[in-house]
Amino acid sequence: MSNKMNEESWNRLSVFYQEFTRISLNNFHYNPYGPGDKELGIIGDVKGLDVLDVGCGCGQNSIVLSKWGAKSVTAIDQSESQLDYAKRLAKREKQDIRILKCDMEDMSILPDASFDLVVSSHAMNYASNIEKVFMECSRVLRYGGRIIICMAHPIWIVLGEALEKGNLNSIANYFDTKRERWDWERRSGEKIATFESTPWRLSQIVNALCNAGFVIKRLEEPRGYSEEEMRKIPADAIPYADAMWRNEEFIKANQIVPYSLIVAAVKQKEAY
């Protein structure tokens, strides 16, 4: 099962990922080298809300929402290594977060209508069935509850890596949505772990949300910061960045096409 492979790969990658990535504990992150929610203002006031973070990784966004005054925060992920780190981080930051091992395509351990807000940052492309994920998100949300998802922008999947590598011959086929297998590598080219992800088309994302009873309220396609802009911003004010080096090729490509697609929607009806 590809989801099992992703779980095992994140268990292998976790220590390296946390060592070589700088992720804010004070601003909700979306885009590498780009603005967070303090700048974009998508999430809004979370005071008094029960929040679910789907694919929480090491829990940085969960910790941020807890600090911002959420009534409760539940964080789920498949990777035990990531969750162990999340528990240590939450304890260090003195935040009371419920952290659970859970598959986002089957959240049956969570009761119906138990959350006001579901958030997810760059987890949805790992799903093998995005309709199942959105159906589950709808099930656990109360009526009028919101979902805010950030995922790989379909335009980036088609063009981004080609621009990053300076090789337009490697432009991907937008209509090919077969699962992709790829390696996470060190800068030296040494493979650390192998993952599978799905290059969801925009229509698949939108239709899956609509079929799950959501009404889309807002779309954002944030441009990442340029090198010039980053020179004027304190390093710790960038919510997500590489810790040891700066990926200049990615930064340049993200000035041309968006890396992330952010969708905010409201649950207003039963799933179809």
Model-inferred region functions:
Residues 1-47, 60-64, 89, 146-184, 223, ...:
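Conserved class I S-adenosyl-L-methionine
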Residues 116-130:
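A short SAM/SAH-binding and catalytic strip from SAM-dependent methyltransferases
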Residues 131-146:
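A short glycine-rich, Lys/Arg-flanked "PGG" loop and its adjoining helix->strand segment in the class I
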Residues 155-158, 190-203:
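Acceptor-substrate binding/catalytic loop of class I
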